[in-house]
Amino acid sequence: MNQEDNTGGGGIFGLFKWTKDALFGTDISPSMKYKDQEERRDRSRYAQDDTNFSMKFGNDSNRRSTNLSRSNSWSGLDSTLHRKYELLPEYNENGFNSIVNGDHHSKERIRSLRSPAPIVPREPLRNEPTDTFGHRLHTKRRTINELSNSQIPFIPPQEDDPLLSKLFNKDGVNEVRRSPYKLSVKDIPGKFPSPLTKRDEIDNYYVRDEDACHKNREYKKAYFDLFAQMDLNSRDLEDLCEDVREQREQFHRNEQTYKQAYEEMRAELVNELKKSKTLFENYYSLGQKYKSLKKVLDQTISHEAELATSRERLYQEEDLKNFEIQTLKQRLSDLELKYTNLQIEKDMQRDNYESEIHDLLLQLSLRNNERKDTSAGSNIFSTGQYDRTPFHNGNNSYDSNSHSWDTDYLKNIDGFIER
């Protein structure tokens, strides 16, 4: 038999091979058999003697190891045998078997098959919808982990539940507990009777029937009271809804009024803002004009100060000029007087010079006449008579009124001097 036949397993052949190996021994050692195996999960198909190994469960987030038991006659079987004969696979504490990984059996199905059927159902909301309050009274409250797999989450009643507190009040429960028998599931209205009845219930049927009728009447009265209270609550709820509707309408009316008032106030505020903007612009322009006028005023004041200084300086210069003019006038008058004196003196000198010239000319003419007389004859002075009146008066002084000159005579003198 080749290596492929040795490694292949499952079905009748695997059982036969296991029997042969158990009786006559195996040709392949366990260490060589599992060498170069790709899938470690196939180790469970072969006998390991007393060797236990750890297996990893991928479905659990916290990977834990578990010890497998000694291999038995069912170790070499594959999942087809379980499906063929409707057998359950090996089930460990985690609710998952690595041999049947990928099988159509799920954890829920395995759990439901292995768990016993409850007499009082633990999930009445899913299994028995006709149960109203029986499971709440006789069933132990389940934890969150037990309810995690339910399609409809079970919500236990609170202590302040009005229906349960009204129907199952503390006094009524204590009275039932003090009764000769305990309240069963069948006594609760709306719950189908259980097919399994107890022995003592059969013996005391008539007594319990009478008590049950009495209790049913009490429960009916409680139900009617609850229905009346529910009717009152419905009326109160309608009134409350009407009040809420009226309050909503009033709220909408107030909101519209507030909205309209807001729009009006907003429009008024916008107009006031526009007016404020215009007023601010005018104020700003007036401020600019005021600054310009103040600047002009400051310049005017400075110019006036400069003008006053210039005027004062001009007044001082005017006084100085007037003083200089007076000085110049005085000097001019002095110069005029001096000029007049000099002119008089000059005239006097000129008169003196003229008289001297006249005397010299007279002497010269006399000398010339004497020479002519000596050379040409006598009576020299018979032809020429000189008048000295233009130059000298009787007092031998200058005549300022006679300024006429004999130009021809002077020319003759000049010609005589040049010769």
UniProtKB/Swiss-Prot annotation:
Residues 229-355 form a coiled coil. It is found in: Cytoplasm, Cytoskeleton, Microtubule organizing center, Spindle pole body. It comes from the Eukaryota. Residues 64-75 have a biased composition (Low complexity). The modification Phosphoserine is found at residues 29, 73, 115. Pfam families: BBP1_C (PF15272), BBP1_N (PF15271). Residues 34-76 are annotated as: Disordered. Its main location: cytoplasm. Keywords: Coiled coil, Cytoplasm, Cytoskeleton, Phosphoprotein. Residues 34-48 have a biased composition (Basic and acidic residues). InterPro entries: Bbp1_C, Bbp1_N. GO terms for cellular component: cytoplasm; spindle pole body. Homodimer. Interacts with KAR1, MPS2 and SPC29. Belongs to the BBP1 family. Component of the spindle pole body (SPB) required for insertion of the nascent SPB into the nuclear envelope and for the proper execution of spindle pole body (SPB) duplication. Connects the central plaque of the SPB with the half-bridge. Required for proper localization of CDC5 at the SPB and for proper M-phase progression. This is Spindle pole component BBP1. It comes from Saccharomyces cerevisiae (strain RM11-1a) (Baker's yeast). The lineage of its organism: Eukaryota, Fungi, Dikarya, Ascomycota, Saccharomycotina.
